Amino acid sequence: ATLAQIVNHNAWPRTSPGEVRRRLASWLESQGIDTTKSFDAVQGAATPRTAGTTDKTSLSEEENMLLKKQVLFPATKKAFGLFRDPFADEAMQGSDDVFTTPDIRYVREALYQTARHGGFMAVIGESGAGKSTLRRDLTERINRENAPVIVIEPYIIAMEDNDVKGKTLKAAAIAEAIISTIAPLESIRRSQDARFRQLHRVLKDSSQAGFSHVLVIEEAHSLPIPTLKHLKRFFELESGFKKLLSIVLIGQPELATKLSERNMEVREVVQRCEVVELLPLDNNLEEFLTFKLQRAGKQLTDIMDASAVDAIRARLSNPGSHRKNMVSLLYPLAVSNLVIAAMNLAAEIGVPQVNADVVKGV
């Protein structure tokens, strides 16, 4: 691995690079090779650097590459005998295509029980953790089982937590979304008091008809604090002992900060909202890759060897603020982009299987 880093990337070991160079030269001479200019071409190709030292430009390029959308080239599909991209969004045709771990199964079932029987929960995960996939799976399951649940999803296209960056989602807009979804033929009242009375009435009428209602807000980390406080009042709309509206918030870790118990502004919400987190794949990485490839008719060993899986895990695990802590970026989207890029590179250079060196070369 050290030699591969020197040859491919001109990355010398941090400790004793001179000693390593001397030993390499000695070995080359023992093979009858003139070492006078052996390292000149390498020096001309790039300025030597030691492993573990990166400038801001190269670090930025690596981060951008991890976030960039990757596409499986036609030549790559042909080389590996694939007829479709197993990691593409289009490969997600139904609930059978959703990869699950014990943690994901819990979140999946908690979402359904909240929608079906009531509750207030927040699903939090990094970008690419699979939040939107679980939201689509919830809608699919409700439709498939013909459950008496009405899903209300306000449009959040321009939503931000202040009016400088975009438009804040206010309680009035949420009320409009609920009324328009449950009673689309009714005209929405203009005055605030009349509108909220109308909201309460249509919820009660729908509930008496046997329906449950769930309000699903994606990108909830962009909700302003006042709207979060108002959601508690939506949640408290009742008909007798029955709650009329369940609430599901889906957002990135910034939402967890807003829902912190140390944030006294939203203490009423925090006491009522269950927060669940979508964790990285970590120990389930190999199962994830196997599942995705099997859905496309391939085995993991047809595409990559064991060293590639370890290299993917190492590539997407970074040291945290403390040396002993590792920050895992093993989320489905990041893993998929890295694997697709590695497969494209393997096909380009003619390697039959993705291995650790190919992953490192991406």
Write out the residue ranges for each language-model feature:
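AAA+/P-loop NTPase substrate/partner-engagement loops
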Residues: 143-177
